[in-house]
């Protein structure tokens, strides 16, 4: 008896283009001709010109383009109810933290937290994202609900892969000093004990896991002590967990590292066991050439978050230089309180443009010694797709996720380019990244299951969800300390 006889089979037929998530090399192509893909169980079984088999489900992808489902490597889902908060709208990182996420965080009870998580996950799924890594730092001593369990539950309801980046802090900065008791730090023992609990309950080390747990102190430079950095790294590696945190999001990280430790943030992390192929950092906007070389040498990855970095005015991560040096690159949406377009299509569109603009800013006229006109070669569409799919899977160790290739997990986004913004494209394959906006998701498959059908998710009433969100925002505005 064949696998086909025992597992459900789906044939996606007649796609206009198939992007693979590959690097664009001869042995790792960025696109394949197809035009068909067969899914058997949770696996991509075949790609090519395929004949239907008796009894299998047929999905007509005529005029559609197919991508690997996006892999989002850094988010803060609880912030889905903090979009466009006026006090932080025009603030840089530090005053924004005090004005928005820290000011409102204590108001998130179980109901509000669950709603925020649901909104964020649905927003991501409807952009073609099937793997979400959430850097959750809503934890405090005596907390009356389990925020980690809620995140896993909501992701499972939608059929998405979920990686919990278990944040937290054992010490606070001055900006947190006068905030509510729900922002109290944890002890290191309590933090480690919860990591061990979560790992035992949820962590799956397999290469296409639906659930993972990651050791992720909120900010290694500020949230834990140098001694605790080494201790948390040792615990993570003992448990077989990866490691993640924020780093070098602004110049403030450089100032702090040099003033406190006399070295760069990346070098400091290296001296405290927080570099390696099992580590990736969000942002890394402000890094120098020596730091990039150290990241590459150790295999430490980056979650590039261009929209949040732009919204907060932090700068643009030097992704081109990182990729050229061999740093593993991925893409993250970051929290919606600093990125109101909290979906992966918006993020990859911005990645494509921002990297080109950054390189173009370095161009000089010939009389000043300039040798190039602009930065259009800084990021190709194929590279951006790779960073947002296979690149993300790589930094999280999901080795059978993130590519449209035979034998990989069947995480597939099928986009219908039926909006005028896509009309006139000479190469429809580039539409979702190059044209921006949110294309209609005709189908999103996660582990072989169709979780989005023509932009709809079974059991989700978007109108009702929007009404509930507006009610909770009004509640938050009434209760927050001005």
UniProtKB/Swiss-Prot annotation:
InterPro entries: Amidohydro-rel, Metal-dep_hydrolase_composite, Metal_Hydrolase, MTA/SAH_deaminase. Substrate binds at residues 79, 249, 283. Its EC number is 3.5.4.11. Its cofactor is Zn(2+). Keywords: Hydrolase, Metal-binding, Zinc. It is an enzyme of class 3 (hydrolase). Binds 1 zinc ion per subunit. Transmembrane segments: none annotated. The keyword Zinc applies. Zn(2+) binds at residues 74, 76, 246, 283, 334. It catalyses: a 2-amino-4-hydroxypteridine + H2O + H(+) = a 2,4-dihydroxypteridine + NH4(+). One of its GO terms (molecular function) is metal ion binding. It comes from the Bacteria. Belongs to the metallo-dependent hydrolases superfamily. ATZ/TRZ family. PANTHER family: AMIDOHYDROLASE-RELATED DOMAIN-CONTAINING PROTEIN (PTHR43794:SF11), AMINOHYDROLASE SSNA-RELATED (PTHR43794). This is Isoxanthopterin deaminase. It comes from Unknown prokaryotic organism. The lineage of its organism: Bacteria, environmental samples.
């Amino acid at each position: 008896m064949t696998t086909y006889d025992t597992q459900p089979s789906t044939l996606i037929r007649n796609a206009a283009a198939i992007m693979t998530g590959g690097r664009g090399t001869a042995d790792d192509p960025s696109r394949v001709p197809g035009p068909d893909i067969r899914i058997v169980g949770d696996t991509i079984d075949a790609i090519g010109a395929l004949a239907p088999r008796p009894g299998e489900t047929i999905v007509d992808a005529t005029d559609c383009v197919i991508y690997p489902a996006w892999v989002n490597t850094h988010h803060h889902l609880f912030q889905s109810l903090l979009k466009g908060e006026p006090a932080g709208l025009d603030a840089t990182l530090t005053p924004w933290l005090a004005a928005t996420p820290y000011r409102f965080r204590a108001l998130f009870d179980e109901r509000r937290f669950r709603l925020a998580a649901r909104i964020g996950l649905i927003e991501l799924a409807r952009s073609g994202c099937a793997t979400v890594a959430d850097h959750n730092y809503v934890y405090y001593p005596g907390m009356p609900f389990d925020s980690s369990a809620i995140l896993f539950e909501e992701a499972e309801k939608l059929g998405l892969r979920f990686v919990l980046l278990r944040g937290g802090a054992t010490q606070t900065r001055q900006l947190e000093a006068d905030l509510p008791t729900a922002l109290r730090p944890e002890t290191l023992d309590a933090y480690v004990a919860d990591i061990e609990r979560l790992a035992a309950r949820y962590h799956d080390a397999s290469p296409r896991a639906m659930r993972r747990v990651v050791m992720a102190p909120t900010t290694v430079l500020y949230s834990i002590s140098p001694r605790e950095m080494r201790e948390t790294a040792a615990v993570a590696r003992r448990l077989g967990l990866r490691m993640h945190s924020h780093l070098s999001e602004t110049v403030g990280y450089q100032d702090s590292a040099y003033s406190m430790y006399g070295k760069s943030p990346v070098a400091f992390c290296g001296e405290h066991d927080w570099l390696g192929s099992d580590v990736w950092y969000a942002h890394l906007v402000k890094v120098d050439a020596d730091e990039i070389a150290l990241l590459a040498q150790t295999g430490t990855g980056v979650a590039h978050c261009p929209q949040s970095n732009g919204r907060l005015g932090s700068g643009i991560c030097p992704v081109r230089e990182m990729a050229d040096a061999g740093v593993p690159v991925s893409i993250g949406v970051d929290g919606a309180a600093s990125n109101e377009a909290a979906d992966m299509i918006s993020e990859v569109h911005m990645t494509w443009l921002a990297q080109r603009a950054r390189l173009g800013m370095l161009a000089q006229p010939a009389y000043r010694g300039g040798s190039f006109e602009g930065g259009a070669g800084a990021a190709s569409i194929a590279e951006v797709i790779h960073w947002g799919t296979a690149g993300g899977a790589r930094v999280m160790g999901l080795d059978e996720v993130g590519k449209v290739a035979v034998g990989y997990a069947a995480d597939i986004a099928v986009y219908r380019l039926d909006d005028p913004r896509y009309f006139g494209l000479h190469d429809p394959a580039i539409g979702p990244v190059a044209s921006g906006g949110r294309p209609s998701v005709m189908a999103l498959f996660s582990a072989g299951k169709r979780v989005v059908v023509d932009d709809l998710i079974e059991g989700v009433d978007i109108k009702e969800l929007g009404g509930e969100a507006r009610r909770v925002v009004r509640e938050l505005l009434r209760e927050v300390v001005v």
